């Protein structure tokens, strides 16, 4: 099963991705983790990504796409994967579609974890990070909405909405149900 997880910062995507990957016996692919591992290992892509990150810039899509494409070449992804944090734009979604087409497969499901803005504010402020001010959090939510609206349209028929308010186990049960598991 090949699954894309979408949701705003604080929706619990990373936690649910781990739980789903464990339950389904497939890897969780997080672009953040891919960047960290490639930087730590000193790969060519890692060195290039580090230049952007050190400058405080976003890593260009072509570089992110290459990292994901390389990860999809690993044997553990043959039975499927959970993508967490990718794609973030229609451009990346189209690149992913092409990567999977070359492997004669496609995305099986897109789960959108939905949480109210008030709940997200509380969750993110509760993390106690110094940079998580209301202004910064609200801006991150706006950026997410602006980026994700076109993505939801792109994946239209594959998107299943998951109510992400509740305990970890309640949200997990809803996610499994949305996947028909």
UniProtKB/Swiss-Prot annotation:
Keywords: ATP-binding, Cytoplasm, Kinase, Nucleotide biosynthesis, Nucleotide-binding, Transferase. GO terms for molecular function: adenylate kinase activity; ATP binding. GO terms for cellular component: cytoplasm. Residues 30-59 are annotated as: NMP. Gene3D superfamilies: P-loop containing nucleotide triphosphate hydrolases. Catalyzes the reversible transfer of the terminal phosphate group between ATP and AMP. Plays an important role in cellular energy homeostasis and in adenine nucleotide metabolism. PANTHER family: NUCLEOTIDE KINASE. This is Adenylate kinase.
């Amino acid at each position: 099963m090949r699954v894309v997880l979408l949701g705003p910062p604080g929706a619990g995507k990373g936690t649910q991705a781990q739980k789903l990957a464990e339950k389904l016996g497939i890897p969780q692919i997080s672009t953040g983790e891919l960047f960290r591992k490639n930087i730590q290992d000193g790969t060519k892509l890692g060195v290039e990504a580090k230049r952007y990150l050190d400058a405080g810039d976003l890593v260009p899509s072509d570089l992110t796409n290459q990292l994901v494409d390389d990860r999809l070449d690993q044997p553990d992804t043959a039975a499927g994967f959970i993508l967490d944090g990718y794609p973030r734009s229609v451009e990346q979604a189209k690149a992913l579609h092409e990567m999977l087409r070359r492997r004669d497969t496609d995305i099986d499901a897109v789960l959108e974890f939905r949480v109210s803005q008030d709940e997200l504010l509380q969750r993110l402020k509760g993390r106690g990070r110094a940079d998580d001010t209301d202004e910064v959090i609200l801006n991150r939510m706006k950026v997410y909405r602006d980026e994700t609206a076109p993505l939801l349209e792109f994946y239209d028929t594959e998107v299943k909405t998951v109510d992400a308010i509740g305990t970890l186990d309640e949200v997990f049960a809803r996610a499994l149900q949305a996947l028909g598991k």
